[in-house]
C-alpha cells in the first residue's frame, strides 16, 4: 500500500514538472534538472538544521518565540531584538544551505562562487523578510489597540514565518546550485519549480510517515504540491529578472520605458541602476511568493482547502504568463545583442 501511494506521489511530481519543463524556450539538459531535483530533496536539511539549533541551543529562535519581542516589548526594543534574531536565523539557513550544496556538488568551485556572490547580495533579502513579519505583527497590534479586537497574530505570524523560511531556503538552493546555468529568465522559473516540487515531494513523505496516514499523499499531490511549485515559480521569475538586471535595465532605460524613480533612487543609494533593479526584483519575488504561500497555508489551517482550488488556478495562470513574458524578454535581449 505504501508503494502505491509513493508511486502516485512520484507520478504527480513528474507530471507537474514535465508540464512546465516543456514550456521552456531552450530546455535545460536532463542532468541539470536531475541535480536540481536532488538539491530540492535536500532543502529539508537546512530546515532541520535550524530546528535543531533552536531546540538544543537557542529556543528564542523558534517559530513562535521569535515573534514575542514584537508582541510583548516596546516598539524599538522589540524591533531591535527581532531583527537581531532574524539575522541569526538567516545566517543559520544560509550556512546549512551552503554546506548542503557544497556536499552535493563535491565542493565544486562553481558552487563556491555562487555562494560568494549570493552572500554579497543577501542584506536586502534579510531586510525584506524581517520587515514583512514586523509590519504584519505591528499592524495587528495597532488593530487590537484601536478596535479592541483580539487577533490571532501568533498563528498568522508563525504561518508567514514558516513560509518565508521555506521560500528562502528553496531560493538559496537555486542560487547556490544553478546560478551559472541560468541562460534566460525561463531557466530560473523552471529550475525554481523543480526545486519546489522536490521540496514538496520530500515534505509530503515526511508528513505521511509522521502521521501514519499515507492516504494524505493524494490531496497533497493535488493541492499542496502545486502551491509549492507556484510559489517557487513566482520567486523564480523575479529572480530571473534580477539575474539579467544589467541587460534588462540597459534596454528599458535606453528606450525610455524605465520607471521614473530609478532616475534618482540609484543616485541616493550610490548604486548602479542594474543593482537597484536586481535587489528590487529579489525582494518583490520573495514578498509575492511568501504571500501566496501564506494565504494558502492559512486556508488549510482554517479547513478551507476548497478555496485553494481557484487560488491554484490563478497561480498556474500567473506562471504561464511569466513564461510568456520571459520569452519576450529573451527575444528582446537577443535582438539587442545582434544589433550591437
Language-model segments: residues:
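Hydrophobic alpha-helical segments at protein termini of multi-pass membrane proteins
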Residues: 1-340
Amino acid at each position: 500500500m505504501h508503494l502505491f501511494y509513493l508511486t502516485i506521489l512520484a507520478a504527480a511530481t513528474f507530471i507537474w514538472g514535465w508540464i512546465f519543463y516543456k514550456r521552456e524556450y531552450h530546455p535545460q539538459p536532463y542532468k541539470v534538472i536531475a541535480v536540481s531535483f536532488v538539491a530540492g530533496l535536500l532543502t529539508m536539511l537546512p530546515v532541520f538544521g535550524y530546528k535543531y539549533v533552536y531546540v538544543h541551543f537557542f529556543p528564542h529562535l523558534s517559530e513562535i518565540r521569535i515573534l514575542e519581542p514584537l508582541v510583548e516589548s516596546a516598539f524599538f526594543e522589540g524591533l531591535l531584538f527581532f531583527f537581531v534574531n532574524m539575522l541569526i536565523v538567516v545566517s543559520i539557513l544560509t550556512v546549512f544551505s551552503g554546506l548542503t550544496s557544497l556536499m552535493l556538488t563535491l565542493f565544486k568551485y562553481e558552487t563556491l562562487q555562487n555562494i560568494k556572490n549570493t552572500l554579497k547580495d543577501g542584506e536586502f533579502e534579510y531586510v525584506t523578510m524581517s520587515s514583512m513579519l514586523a509590519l504584519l505583527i505591528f499592524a495587528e497590534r495597532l488593530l487590537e489597540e484601536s478596535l479592541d479586537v483580539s487577533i490571532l497574530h501568533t498563528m498568522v505570524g508563525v504561518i508567514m514565518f514558516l513560509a518565508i523560511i521555506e521560500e528562502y531556503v528553496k531560493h538559496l538552493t537555486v542560487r547556490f546550485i544553478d546560478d551559472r546555468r541560468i541562460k534566460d529568465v525561463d531557466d530560473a522559473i523552471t529550475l525554481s519549480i523543480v526545486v519546489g516540487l522536490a521540496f514538496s515531494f520530500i515534505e509530503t513523505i515526511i508528513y505521511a510517515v509522521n502521521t501514519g496516514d499515507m492516504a494524505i499523499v493524494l490531496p497533497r499531490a493535488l493541492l499542496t504540491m502545486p502551491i509549492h511549485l507556484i510559489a517557487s515559480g513566482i520567486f523564480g521569475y523575479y529572480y530571473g529578472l534580477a539575474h539579467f538586471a544589467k541587460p534588462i535595465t540597459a534596454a528599458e532605460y535606453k528606450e525610455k520605458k524605465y520607471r521614473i524613480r530609478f532616475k534618482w533612487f540609484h543616485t541616493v543609494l550610490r548604486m548602479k541602476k542594474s543593482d537597484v533593479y536586481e535587489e528590487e526584483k529579489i525582494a518583490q519575488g520573495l514578498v509575492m511568493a511568501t504571500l501566496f504561500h501564506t494565504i494558502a497555508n492559512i486556508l488549510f489551517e482554517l479547513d478551507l482547502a476548497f478555496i485553494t482550488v481557484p487560488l491554484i488556478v490563478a497561480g498556474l495562470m500567473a506562471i504561464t504568463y511569466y513564461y510568456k513574458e520571459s520569452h519576450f524578454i529573451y527575444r528582446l535581449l537577443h535582438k539587442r545583442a545582434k544589433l550591437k
